[in-house]
């Protein structure tokens, strides 16, 4: 198999003024603009608001399920194209005048600028790629895991302010990382490519629209089987079936609770969960994920569990995100939380230290290494280029796209500063007057805001030039865990206001660059993003509130009926993180008072690793494969595990290799024409079938769980411990 290299973008500051200095931009983005195209249309508002509300609802709704589904902006990009054209055909062209203002429901053909703004609405509804507002997870763990109360008002303020705060940081940094041509934002270039493909004249026998409809119908019809009639299709773990009484065999073969050897799925929600659609991931990235996954799952974990019994691994399941006590039983979190939402030291000392499954512990160590290696890797391999690009971005010379954007009124700075001030004031109100509900003191908010402002500049520059976004969340968790131990909600709130608001800022900036390339009036972008964010956040928390108050025992896997979909795997990991970093604190987990201080050495490993790769590249410059070693990706490959499982990775890698290597190499024209359309159709089909099944069958209690194929993957022993004397329901005692 031939190696596929990712080349650094060629930047030439001496190019002609009518060309971008970045080669990828020159090849993809049009140098022309038509300012007469209407953007503030009824079609844009109707389809944009509808898309925002639908995606907010669906992503929040499916986020609580065992196999969460995230519907992205790409689905809306494809679906709204025929809808926009249909509205252009059927809406009346009558013009209405109100004073000097003229309005029409149908000002002309549906155009690409309307389409871009609709997609920005949808991107807000999709949580800018995360599915739902991150702060919703805080409400989830308060109500479902800690069994405490929080008001809807406090929840709404928390969700909205953490989103809008990021918008304020984005406004401050916009001139530095959006306008300069050297800040080229690779993912925005990808979106431009898709928009241009969708709006090109299509006279082929199998148009993209027709292909989408066919794939959508097939996806819609098929999903009833893995979602309702034949649940085993979500994880076909045949090794468990061959060895129904062997714990070791089921640990090896389970796709949900084990190493997943031979496990696969015929369910798109399993394939696209956690890692996103493999159809839109570059092959180079897939190979890095594959190598990292194999190293961790099939080398490190077996040696740690069976070979060395690291951290008393045999007392616990081989793959679990749960927290345990020394006897291998589930840790009773509720007993160590007092009525002030703080750590009850007396009960904690009685119950003892917190233990993690070996996989969960090692995944934290790998996460430490991945964070540091990201910064080291970028400094060594991209530092010189980034510095040159930052220096170039301060020059007065503008590229063709920035000059074309000068035709439109810019966004006044006070718009951003006003939003920033309002969100900070509301956040302070939350911290001062509703402190009992969120625990975070006012100084915590100010410190988190300072960290966000500090990190937004370097991280956004790294993302804009290298397409790598360092994950700095553990830094905020670690810091607050040390400053204010024993307060779990304060810890997650600090992380959300600090790291997540910075992450939101980067998402906003990415959308701004897309609008920059597509020549969208800046004020239109601002209003669409702001309105979409407020609507999406409101829908997110409303749907979450409904599910949390209406689904009995939601997120409580041990109390739910067998095969219930409401297990909230992502919230379980989020809850465990709040316990580790907030309630118990880093000192009692990873410090001298805990079981895992040795994991701190992974920080050093992450620091040294990229240096070794860099030295190897310098020593052997002709060995091109060395330059393709990307330790942040290799180490971060398993960052989604848990809650992602081995069957998710198995299927994602297989499908990704098929489409982004074989199909891309041997059927490139098909890939260019239909690959993204197929991904969007698969997402949309199962999403609509999932909602239909819930409202027509699940809500009415209609199930068919009496037969073998409706009982999941049938690996009941995969989660059993193998240490002598450990008692777990349903497991043999050694």
UniProtKB/Swiss-Prot annotation:
It comes from the Eukaryota. This is Oligopeptide transporter 2. The keyword Membrane applies. The keyword Chaperone does not apply. Involved in the translocation of tetra- and pentapeptides across the cellular membrane in an energy-dependent manner. It comes from Arabidopsis thaliana. It is found in: Membrane. GO terms for molecular function: oligopeptide transmembrane transporter activity. Pfam families: OPT. InterPro entries: Oligpept_transpt, OPT. GO terms for biological process: protein transport. Its main location: membrane. Disulfide bonds: none annotated. Keywords: Membrane, Peptide transport, Protein transport, Transmembrane, Transmembrane helix, Transport. Induction: Highly induced by iron deficiency. It is a multi-pass membrane protein. The gene is OPT2. One of its GO terms (cellular component) is membrane. The chain crosses the membrane at residues 44-64, 68-88, 125-145, 152-172, 211-231, 252-272, 283-303, 359-379, 414-434, 442-462, 525-545, 596-616, 644-664, 677-697. Expressed in flowers, leaves, roots, and stems. Belongs to the oligopeptide OPT transporter (TC 2.A.67.1) family.
């Amino acid at each position: 198999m031939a190696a596929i290299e990712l080349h650094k973008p060629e930047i030439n500051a001496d190019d002609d003024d009518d060309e971008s200095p970045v080669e990828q931009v020159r090849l993809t983005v049009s140098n022309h603009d038509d300012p007469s195209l209407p953007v503030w249309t009824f079609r844009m508002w109707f389809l944009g608001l509808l898309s925002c509300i639908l995606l907010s609802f669906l992503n929040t709704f499916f986020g609580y399920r065992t196999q969460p589904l995230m519907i992205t902006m790409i689905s809306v990009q494809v679906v709204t194209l025929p809808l926009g054209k249909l509205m252009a055909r059927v809406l009346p062209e009558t013009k209405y005048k109100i004073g000097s203002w003229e309005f029409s429901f149908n000002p002309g053909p549906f155009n690409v600028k309307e389409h871009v703004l609709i997609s920005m609405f949808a991107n807000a509804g999709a949580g800018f790629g995360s599915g739902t507002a991150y702060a919703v997870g805080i409400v989830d763990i308060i109500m479902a895991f800690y069994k405490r109360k929080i008001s809807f008002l406090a929840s709404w303020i928390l969700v909205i302010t953490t989103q809008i705060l990021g918008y304020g940081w984005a406004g401050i940094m916009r001139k530095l990382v959006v306008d300069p041509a050297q800040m080229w934002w690779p993912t925005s270039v990808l979106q431009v490519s898709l928009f241009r493909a969708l709006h090109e004249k299509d006279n082929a026998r199998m148009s993209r629209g027709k292909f989408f409809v066919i794939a959508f119908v097939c996806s819609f019809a098929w999903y009833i089987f893995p979602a309702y009639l034949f649940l085993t299709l979500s994880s076909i773990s045949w090794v468990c079936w061959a060895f129904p009484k062997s714990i070791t065999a089921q640990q090896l073969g389970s796709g949900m609770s084990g190493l997943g050897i031979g496990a696969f799925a015929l369910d798109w929600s399993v394939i696209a969960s956690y890692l996103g659609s493999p159809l839109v991931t570059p092959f180079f990235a897939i190979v890095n994920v594959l190598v990292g996954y194999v190293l961790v799952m099939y080398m490190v974990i077996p040696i740690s569990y069976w070979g060395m019994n690291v951290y008393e691994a045999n007392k616990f399941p081989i793959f679990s995100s749960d927290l345990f006590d020394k006897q291998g039983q589930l840790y009773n979190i509720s007993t160590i939380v007092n009525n002030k939402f703080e750590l009850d030291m007396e009960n904690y000392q009685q119950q003892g230290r917190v233990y993690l499954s070996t996989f969960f512990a090692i995944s934290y160590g790998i996460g430490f290494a991945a964070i540091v290696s990201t910064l080291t890797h970028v400094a060594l391999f991209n530092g010189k280029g980034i510095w040159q690009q930052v220096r170039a971005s301060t020059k007065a010379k503008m590229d063709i796209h920035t000059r074309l954007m000068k035709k439109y009124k810019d966004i006044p700075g006070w718009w951003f500063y006003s939003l920033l001030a309002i969100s900070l004031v509301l956040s302070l109100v939350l911290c001062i007057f509703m402190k009992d509900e969120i625990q975070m003191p006012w100084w915590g908010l100010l410190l988190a805001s300072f960290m966000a402002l500090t990190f937004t500049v370097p991280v956004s520059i790294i993302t804009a030039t290298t397409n790598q976004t360092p994950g700095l969340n553990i830094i905020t968790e670690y810091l607050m865990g040390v400053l204010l131990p024993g307060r779990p909600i304060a810890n997650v709130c600090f992380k959300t206001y600090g790291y997540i608001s910075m992450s939101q800022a980067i998402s906003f900036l990415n959308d701004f660059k897309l609008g920059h390339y597509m020549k969208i009036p800046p004020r239109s972008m601002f209003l669409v993003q702001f309105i979409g964010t407020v609507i999406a956040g409101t829908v997110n928390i409303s749907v979450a509130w409904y599910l949390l108050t209406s689904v009995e025992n939601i997120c409580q896997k041990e109390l739910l009926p067998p095969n219930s979909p409401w297990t909230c795997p992502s919230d379980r990991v989020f809850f465990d993180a709040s316990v580790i970093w907030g309630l118990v604190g880093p000192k009692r987990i990873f410090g001298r008072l805990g079981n895992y201080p040795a994991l701190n050495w992974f920080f050093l490993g992450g620091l040294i690793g990229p240096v070794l790769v860099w030295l190897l590249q310098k020593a052997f410059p002709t060995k091109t494969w060395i330059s393709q070693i990307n330790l942040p990706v290799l180490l971060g490959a398993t960052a989604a595990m848990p809650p992602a499982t081995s069957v998710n990775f198995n299927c994602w890698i297989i499908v990704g290799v098929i489409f982004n290597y074989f199909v891309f190499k041997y059927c490139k024209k098909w890939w260019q024409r239909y690959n993204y359309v197929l991904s969007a159709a698969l997402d949309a089909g199962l999403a609509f079938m999932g909602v239909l099944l819930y409202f027509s069958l699940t809500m009415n209690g209609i199930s068919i769980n009496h037969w073998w194929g409706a009982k999941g993957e049938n690996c009941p022993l995969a989660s059993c411990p193998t240490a002598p004397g450990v008692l777990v329901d349903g497991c043999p005692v050694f």
